[in-house]
A protein has these predicted regions:
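Flexible glycine-/small-residue-rich
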Residues: 13-15, 30-32, 128-130
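General small-molecule cofactor/ligand-binding pocket signal
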Residues: 12, 161-164
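Glycine-rich, charged/polar anion/phosphate-binding loops
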Residues: 14-17, 110-112
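Conserved beta-strand and immediately adjacent loop positions that scaffold enzyme active sites
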Residues: 10-11, 27, 75, 172
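AMP-binding/adenylate-forming catalytic core of the ANL superfamily
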Residues: 34, 39, 48-52, 60, ...
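Conserved ATP/PPi-binding loop(s) of AMP-dependent carboxylate-activating enzymes
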Residues: 4-8, 17-55, 93, 188-189, ...
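Acidic, glycine/GT-rich loop-and beta-edge segments that sit at the periphery of enzyme/chaperone cores
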Residues: 5-8, 204-213
């Protein structure tokens, strides 16, 4: 939990209707300009890409796509990217809620969770990069699920856990849930030029564990 909002910044959490909320999850917004706010994108002459990235969700209000909660003490919890939120059984889950639990295990270096369309719903798929020499045994999978269930809810527990050799990231170092989700659904990934290691996407393609009957 962050102890406080950015000093001098009009940071709030808004629900889907644009109402300010506290004690519940929503979109992180900033109602007024702030010193570190970018003023545009390179080669975006009419500003359309810039506006679409930050001002399309709530017209005129900065919203960069973080799923967050303002706590009763005035702190802030970030749950991950709002466009990567999982929705099994209609329950919205931030991916960071899962990562915090999984990466407590010494065997796990890092992880990425995505939602896979499944039987008129969405199932949670967790992909883990393990330390050298570690295998994803049934026992390790059960420990991962137990750790998640103990500290979150049964809805957070992944239906499938698979091991991957690498996890794709942007050039700035952020993992890319949306690109991985597109790959496991057989969709084209739009902007691989933004990835530092686009070859890592191949570890998620046509996985037999994720085959839809």
């Amino acid at each position: 939990e962050l102890q406080t909002r950015g000093l001098g910044m009009a940071v709030e959490v808004w629900d889907e209707t644009g109402e300010s909320v506290s004690g519940t999850k929503g979109e992180l917004v900033c109602r007024a300009p702030f010193p570190s706010m970018p003023i545009g994108f390179w080669a975006d002459e009419d500003g359309s890409r810039y506006r679409a990235a930050y001002f399309e969700r709530f017209p005129g209000v900065w919203c960069h796509g973080d799923y967050a909660e303002l706590t009763a003490t005035g702190g802030m919890i970030i749950y991950g990217r709002s466009d990567a939120v999982l929705n099994p059984g209609g329950v919205r889950i931030g991916t960071a809620e899962i990562y915090r639990q999984v990466e407590k295990l010494d065997e796990v270096v890092e992880s990425i969770a995505v939602g896979q369309d499944w039987a008129d719903d969405v199932r949670v798929v967790l992909c883990v990069r393990l330390r050298h020499g570690v295998e994803l045994t049934d026992e390790l999978q059960e420990r991962i699920r137990r750790e998640i269930r103990r500290n979150t809810t049964p809805r957070h527990v992944p239906a499938k856990i698979i091991a991957v050799a690498d996890i794709p990231r942007t050039i700035s170092g952020k993992i890319v849930e949306l690109a991985v989700r597109d790959v496991i659904h057989g969709r084209r990934v739009a902007n691989t030029d933004a990835l530092a290691n686009p070859e890592a996407l191949e570890y998620f393609r046509d996985r037999p564990e994720l085959a839809v009957d």
